[in-house]
Amino acid sequence: MNIQKVWDAFIKENDNTSFVEMANAVVEQLGGVDEDTILNSLYSCRNANDGYTGFCYFSETSKFWNENKSVIIENMHELADDFGEDLITMIKGFNNFKDDEDITYDAIGKALYAPFDENESRYIYDTFAKYALEEVANRFQYWWYEQDESEFDD
């Protein structure tokens, strides 16, 4: 199977520029376009907390967030709009945050819009980075399920 052909076809299906940027950043963080990344990591990802290469440690996820903040925020805004919610309310509803009294609306807003501060917001940054991984993985899984694998043979 030609994995680059698989990835290129998936990207071509997604005409949303910010999603494409986020997807490419996620795949790069996972290790690049190869069979392990695409078929094992993206296809099998159900929960980003399960420990995927590049998304295990706060230092990795905070750096990923800082480098890709604008495209992740843009994608989160689009999802919030789809849900008919404002961005911060949607984020507060994430499983990691909804029952955590320490994660306030103000803390989320600060993590989104204040200057990067890994020490103060690392847990929130970690969740934002893992949101990106799960969003890309979910879209890839849905797309891959509809594909005829023989189209991607060498």
Predicted regions and their residues:
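Short, extreme N-terminal segment that most often corresponds to the first beta-strand
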Residues: 1-21, 145-146
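N-terminal targeting leader peptides, primarily classical Sec-type signal peptides for secretion
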Residues: 6, 152-154
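Acidic, low-complexity, intrinsically disordered interaction modules
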Residues: 25-152
